[in-house]
Curated annotation (Swiss-Prot):
Domain DRBM: 160-229
Residues holding Mg(2+): 46, 119, 122
Any one GO biological process: tRNA processing
Highest taxon, organism lineage: Bacteria
Top EC group: hydrolase
Protein name: Ribonuclease 3
The protein's assembly and partners: Homodimer.
Matching PANTHER family: RIBONUCLEASE 3 (PTHR11207:SF0), RIBONUCLEASE III (PTHR11207)
Natural source organism: Clostridium perfringens (strain 13 / Type A)
Function description: Digests double-stranded RNA. Involved in the processing of primary rRNA transcript to yield the immediate precursors to the large and small rRNAs (23S and 16S). Processes some mRNAs, and tRNAs when they are encoded in the rRNA operon. Processes pre-crRNA and tracrRNA of type II CRISPR loci if present in the organism.
Family membership noted in the UniProt record: Belongs to the ribonuclease III family.
InterPro entries: dsRBD_dom, RNase_III, RNase_III_dom, RNase_III_sf
Active site: 50, 122
Pfam families (UniProt xref): dsrm, Ribonucleas_3_3
Length: 237
């Protein structure tokens, strides 16, 4: 892949970086780093960005929705920061176009993959925080997540299928929900996870994803579809 056009990326996210290297790292997938020695990739930045995102969203919700209980705020935050929401924001910013990855990863659809785009966005958030500080990072997050926050507040989106399934089942009494990782296959940078969801020892949903979290969400989604709680779709989370 060609070098990242940093000028384009900075225009898209609305921030000019002092340290260009941290932005490049944020947009580098592990599969790319596996091909070249001494190339940093975005996994550690993703870890930091997740915490920065959680903090900024939590502070915003706490300050602006004083009528909401702790439980309600927790549920709203979960919707805002979940992988699917991150993917939507990442797509809006066209980050997928600029992620450095191996040719093999790209040929298997990596550029459009939910987990890769979501991870890259978290890494970019960390890069903004490290380069510009918490205030600029907070502004960046609120500017790009405002629509997601509004939809979560208005209950227009259900993104956390595991939580939704638990709520549906608890209405009918106590149930035993188990997510069983059946297998995983593929190389480390392109590994697929397969999960069975058991409700009272009966398989009610099966999910596949490029992370354990994604496969569990897809299994929960399949169970909700089977129970008639959401419509059947071809696309997974």
């Amino acid at each position: 892949m060609k070098d990242i056009n940093l000028i384009e990326v900075e225009k898209l996210i609305g921030i000019e970086f002092e340290n260009k290297g941290v932005l490049i790292t944020a947009l580098t997938h592990s599969s790319y780093a596996n091909q070249f020695k001494d190339v940093k990739y975005n996994e550690r930045l993703e870890f930091l960005g997740d915490s920065v995102l959680q903090l900024c969203v939590t502070k915003y919700l706490f300050n602006n929705y004083k009528d909401k209980s702790e439980g309600e705020l927790t549920k709203i935050r979960a919707l805002v920061v979940c992988e699917n929401s991150l993917h939507k924001v990442s797509k809006n910013l066209s980050l997928g176009k600029y992620i450095r990855m191996s040719k093999g990863e790209e040929l298997t659809g990596g550029r459009e993959r939910t987990s890769i785009q979501a991870d890259a966005l978290e890494a970019v958030i960390a890069a903004v925080y490290l380069d510009k500080g918490i205030e600029v990072a907070n502004d960046f997050i609120l500017r790009n997540f405002k629509d997601v926050i509004d939809k979560a507040i208005n209950e227009e989106i259900i993104l956390d299928f595991k939580t939704r399934l638990q709520e549906v089942l608890q209405k009918n009494g106590e149930v035993n929900i188990v997510y069983n990782l059946v297998k995983h296959e593929g190389p480390p940078h392109r590994r697929k996870f397969f999960t069975d969801l058991l409700i009272n020892n009966e398989i009610m949903g099966q999910g596949v994803g490029f992370s354990k979290k994604e496969s569990e969400q897809n299994a929960a989604k399949a169970a909700l579809q089977r129970l008639g709680e959401i419509k059947w779709e071809k696309d997974t989370i």
